[in-house]
Regions:
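Bacterial N-terminal signal peptides that target proteins for export
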Residues: 1-15
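C-terminal segment of classical bacterial N-terminal signal peptides
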Residues: 16-28
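Bilobed "Venus flytrap"/periplasmic-binding protein-like clamshell domains
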Residues: 33-61, 66-69, 127-194, 203-206, ...
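Sec-exported extracytoplasmic/periplasmic mature domains
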Residues: 55-63, 84-88, 103, 136, ...
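Short, hydrophobic alpha-helical packing/hinge segments within bilobed ligand-binding/sensory domains
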Residues: 76-80, 186-189
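Pocket-lining segment of extracytoplasmic ligand-binding domains
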Residues: 95-97, 104-113, 119-120, 135-137, ...
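Ligand-binding clefts/hinges and TM-proximal coupling segments of bilobed small-molecule sensing domains
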Residues: 143, 148-167, 238-308
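An extracytoplasmic/periplasmic, membrane-proximal ligand-sensing/linker region
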Residues: 185, 202-223, 233-235, 277-345
Length: 345
C-alpha cells in the first residue's frame, strides 16, 4: 500500500509539474507573436472599419505569427507619417496621398521619414468625392461654385477626400473654405448652419462611411452635382469624373437620379521593413477571399471583379514610386508586371 501511495503521489506530482510547465510555456508562446500595427484614419471612417474587419484574415494569412492591432489617427496623412516614424507597419493611404508624399508637398512638405518609405503594396477600393447639403438649404446650390468661399466640412483635414477636394477646387479656381468638426457632429453642424455643405463619399459607388449613415438617418440631405462646365474643367485638369447610383449607397432619396463625383483609389501600403514574403502572403489571401470580401462589404466589389487591374491602376497613378517586392512577385506570377515600373530596394 505504501508503494502504491508513493506511486500515486509521484504520478500526481509529475502530472502537476507537466501541467504547470505547459501553462508556463503557453503564455511564452503567445508573447512570441509579433505585432503588426495597422494605422488607419479616424474611428467611424471607412478606412478604419475595413482594417478592423480584416484583422482576423490577416492574422490567419500569416499563420498566427502576428497580432494585428488597428490604430486610428486623425487622417491618412498622419497615419502614413506614423508608420514611417516607426509607430506602425501598415499605412492607410490613397493615390493622391502617395503623390503628395513622393513630391513632399502639402502635409509632407519638409517631412523626413525615420523608417523606410512606404511603397506600392496593396490597393483595395475606389472612393468617390461627392457634395451634399440639407434638403432645406438645397435650393441655394445649383453647382459646386455655389460652395466656393462658404463654410463646408470637406471630411477631416488630412483625409484623402479632403485633399481630393483641394485639387478639385484648384482645377475649378474656387475658394476652399474648410470648417473642421468632429465626424459625429456632421448632422448637428449642418442643421445649425455652422456649415452649409458637407462632402460625402461613397466606396465603389455603394458603401457610406459610418458617420454619413448616421447623418442621413437623422436628416434629409440633397446631393449637389457639378454643372457641365465644371465637369469639363475637372476632366481638363486630368481628373476623372464618375456617376454613382445614389440608391446603391443612400437609404433615402437625395434629390438626384445620378450623383456625380471625382474618384480616388485607396490602399494600405508598407515599407521595406515588412518582408517580401509577408506582403506576398497577404496579397494571396486577399486575392483568394476577394469574392467573400465583396459579399461582406460592397465597397470591395471593384477589387473582386478585377483584383489585378486595381493593383496596376494604383501603381500607374504614381509610376515613379517603387513597388514592394511582395507585390512585384505577385504581379509577375499573374503576368501583370510592367518593366516600366521599379521594384523597391
Amino acid at each position: 500500500m505504501k508503494t502504491s501511495r508513493g506511486y500515486i503521489f509521484t504520478a500526481f506530482v509529475a502530472v502537476f509539474a507537466g501541467t504547470f510547465a505547459f501553462s508556463a510555456i503557453a503564455p511564452a508562446h503567445a508573447q512570441q507573436r509579433k505585432s503588426l500595427r495597422w494605422a488607419t484614419s479616424a474611428v467611424g471612417s471607412y478606412g478604419y472599419n475595413v482594417a478592423a474587419a480584416m484583422t482576423k484574415l490577416v492574422e490567419e494569412a500569416l499563420g498566427g505569427e502576428y497580432t494585428v492591432t488597428v490604430q486610428p489617427y486623425t487622417s491618412p496623412t498622419v497615419a502614413m507619417k506614423s508608420v514611417m516614424d516607426g509607430n506602425g507597419e501598415i499605412a492607410y493611404t490613397a493615390d493622391i496621398g502617395m503623390t503628395e508624399f513622393h513630391q513632399r508637398i502639402g502635409g509632407f512638405k519638409g517631412y523626413k521619414p525615420k523608417m523606410p518609405e512606404i511603397v506600392h503594396s496593396w490597393y483595395a477600393y475606389p472612393m468617390e468625392s461627392i457634395m451634399a447639403t440639407t434638403a432645406a438649404r438645397a435650393a441655394q446650390f445649383k453647382c459646386w461654385k455655389d460652395f466656393s468661399g462658404k463654410p463646408v466640412f470637406y471630411t477631416n483635414a488630412g483625409f484623402m477626400n479632403w485633399l481630393n477636394w483641394q485639387r478639385i477646387y484648384k482645377a475649378l479656381g474656387y475658394e476652399f473654405k474648410h470648417v473642421q468638426i468632429d465626424l459625429k457632429a456632421n448632422a448637428d453642424a449642418l442643421q445649425a448652419g455652422s456649415i452649409v455643405g458637407s462632402a460625402t463619399y461613397t466606396t465603389a459607388g455603394r458603401s457610406l462611411a459610418a458617420y454619413w449613415k448616421e447623418t442621413e438617418l437623422r436628416m434629409d440631405i440633397r446631393i449637389i452635382n457639378p454643372c457641365p462646365e465644371e465637369v469639363a474643367k475637372i476632366k481638363a485638369a486630368g481628373l476623372a469624373v464618375v456617376e454613382v447610383d445614389p440608391k446603391q449607397a443612400f437609404s433615402k432619396d437625395v434629390g438626384v437620379k445620378t450623383a456625380v463625383g471625382v474618384p480616388i483609389l485607396f490602399g494600405y501600403n508598407v515599407g521595406l521593413n515588412i518582408s517580401e514574403n509577408i506582403v506576398y502572403k497577404l496579397l494571396g489571401a486577399f486575392y483568394k477571399n476577394k469574392d467573400n470580401l465583396a459579399k461582406t462589404d460592397p465597397g470591395f466589389t471593384p477589387m473582386a471583379k478585377d483584383f489585378i487591374g486595381m493593383q496596376v491602376q494604383g501603381i500607374n497613378a504614381n509610376p515613379d514610386i517603387a513597388v514592394h517586392p511582395g507585390l512585384a512577385r505577385f504581379l509577375k506570377e499573374h503576368k501583370a508586371w510592367s518593366e516600366k515600373w521599379k521594384i523597391a530596394g
